[in-house]
Amino acid sequence: DPSQPLSPAPPLSLFKAWAKPIKPFQITEGVWYVGTENLSSILLTTPAGHILIDAGLDESAPQIKANIEAAGFRLTDVRYLLNSHARLDQAGGMARLKAWSGAQLVASQPNADQMARGGREDFALGDALPFPPVTTDKIIHNQESISLGGITVTALFTPGHLPGSTSWRVTLRNGKTLIYADSLATPDYLLINNKNYPDLVTDIQGSFKTLAAQHVDIFIANKGDRFGLLEKRQQLRNGDTQAFFDSNGLQQYVERSRQRFITQLTAQQP
């Protein structure tokens, strides 16, 4: 809607700062971190092929590919690419990683639509942060699962940051549960009566409830600083094989996000 003011887009320098390379490492059996210093990408490995969640910036795609190979895997063995939300920091590298891997891209309908537009016509940011467009192969619905090689990944729709925002619940081969949580932030969004996203407030409130209700063993989020990535990696290096097992981390993340949202919503009340 042309009459709806947009939010200021973060500078590209911020995303580049988040995209510093780090070496891949194993989070737990069958789960590798292959992303950058603050933009998460995780590789779920099985004998039947692999699943990659999120693709960082376009310029990070070669680094993610190199990380997968350094971990001892082949990008061409990735069967599915999953996306949390369709902005340049989570979907920017998707076009290249899809082309290189031959994998099927799986996404919610709104994320698929926005990835096809290369991030343009963003409800909050307009055309400010484009990325290479990419076509989704499979539209996934809320609570729908895909299974591969003994693991099951279920889509949990958690809209608010974007209308298509999706968190992913993973049941690993050993029965442990991992959550890959999408952003719950509404940075500088105009929350009340947003003509481009009328359901924004009710959507994000519903997403707080959805994620707070999940009982998980391992909590991962799509930004490293949301789940203590670097601190937990250090614990892992110090010999703590359970460093990423964090059964309360998701609820703490939701509550922090909810409090920030309440403050923002209160400030915008007429």
Task: List each language-model region with its residue ranges.
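Active-site-proximal beta-strand/loop segments in catalytic clefts of secreted hydrolases
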Residues: T36-E37, P47, A55-G56, S84-A86, ...
